Amino acid sequence: MVAPRALIVLLGLALSGAGAGAAAGAECVALEDFSLGSVGEFPPDWKPRKEEGRSVYSIQEEGGLRFLRAAATRLGVQAGREVAWNLEAYPILAWSWRPIEFPKGSDERKSSTNDSAVSVYAVFPHTPVSVKSVKYIWSRVVPVGTHLTSSAGNTQVRVLRTGPDKVGQWVEEQVNVREDYRKYFGGSDVPRPAGIAVLTDSDDTKSTARGDYAGFRVCKP
């Protein structure tokens, strides 16, 4: 799936008054810790781009940590949560993720193999029927720092990590969403974010992808 997926989770992610939740640290505010909902179920307040996504994503728990597990076989369905925050005060988006199984033969540089074990989107309003987004991926083979585009430029992709060396291990990420938006889309004005989304997909490679996500929060510089 190329064009439909690149259009990224419309999900009703229009700009809203939904704000961030409880503090997750002295300089951070929690967006999602998956503490709501039941283990084994699709998370409340999230929406799949297609209904079949409800079978891909589920809340799990290990050692007291709640997280979102994704397991996709020949599927490419995003899930997202509508949540806005003050980007001027909190430009840093942080989360933890771990790849469990990379899609066989995946390479995000090619439309025929454009699948990822784990990827995270910062979503911004664009038009009444479309969004812009910065997508962060953990690729199987594409070098760290590679910049890719899709959806006629409305999705800008940044490779944060590459390779299987840390398969099964939680890794913490922090990205400056405000700076990345300005870098990739240009201009000094950055719209208020509309939400976050994730995608674990394997439809292009006709294989299986698995990965986990946890602890989404926004932080001061």
Which positions does each model-derived feature cover?
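Short carbohydrate-recognition loop motifs
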Residues: 55-78
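Extracellular carbohydrate-recognition regions
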Residues: 24-50
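Extracellular/lumenal carbohydrate-interaction signature centered on repeated Trp-anchored short motifs
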Residues: 82-93, 164-167, 189
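Extracellular ligand-binding interfaces
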Residues: 100-169, 209-212
